[in-house]
């Protein structure tokens, strides 16, 4: 019997380095450093993808889009998110909501959250109100506090399609 609700959790982290663009939630942000990664290294979208895949018991982003596969080199993470939603929907589920937190010292992300919500909602094909995003710092502690990287955490609720 198909469960009416499923919950998934996702996490991602990438190193901040000069010479890379900074993508967050599908929005390019102006900053002196960007995130290193095989794709565009959008930690927020990657955490959301893992939460969605986890909720549907479909493993993780690295399984579906392995960094060893050259077709994903530099890929726009919005494309990966759209493909993940196709997989989720193929299992008979729709998104209930997403709640995500980004941990970064710089840049300040709160001014960009409405744009990120809009982009994510458009890619996932849901209402903006279904996407909750928050930004925090680590009070200068750890790799995030030293501005060596940015991490993101996400929870997704899936609802069985009627």
From Swiss-Prot:
The record marks 38, 137 as: Transition state stabilizer. The keyword Lyase applies. Pathway: Isoprenoid biosynthesis; isopentenyl diphosphate biosynthesis via DXP pathway; isopentenyl diphosphate from 1-deoxy-D-xylulose 5-phosphate: step 4/6. It comes from the Bacteria. Keywords: Isoprene biosynthesis, Lyase, Metal-binding. A divalent metal cation binds at residues 12, 14, 46. GO terms for molecular function: 2-C-methyl-D-erythritol 2,4-cyclodiphosphate synthase activity; metal ion binding. Binds 1 divalent metal cation per subunit. It is an enzyme of class 4 (lyase). SUPFAM superfamilies: IpsF-like. 4-CDP-2-C-methyl-D-erythritol 2-phosphate binds at residues 12-14, 38-39, 60-62, 136-139, 143, 146. The keyword Transcription regulation does not apply. Pfam families: YgbB (PF02542). It catalyses: 4-CDP-2-C-methyl-D-erythritol 2-phosphate = 2-C-methyl-D-erythritol 2,4-cyclic diphosphate + CMP. Signal peptide: none annotated. GO terms for biological process: isopentenyl diphosphate biosynthetic process, methylerythritol 4-phosphate pathway; terpenoid biosynthetic process. Its EC number is 4.6.1.12. Its cofactor is a divalent metal cation. Belongs to the IspF family. Homotrimer. PANTHER family: 2-C-METHYL-D-ERYTHRITOL 2,4-CYCLODIPHOSPHATE SYNTHASE, CHLOROPLASTIC (PTHR43181:SF1). Involved in the biosynthesis of isopentenyl diphosphate (IPP) and dimethylallyl diphosphate (DMAPP), two major building blocks of isoprenoid compounds. Catalyzes the conversion of 4-diphosphocytidyl-2-C-methyl-D-erythritol 2-phosphate (CDP-ME2P) to 2-C-methyl-D-erythritol 2,4-cyclodiphosphate (ME-CPP) with a corresponding release of cytidine 5-monophosphate (CMP). This is 2-C-methyl-D-erythritol 2,4-cyclodiphosphate synthase.
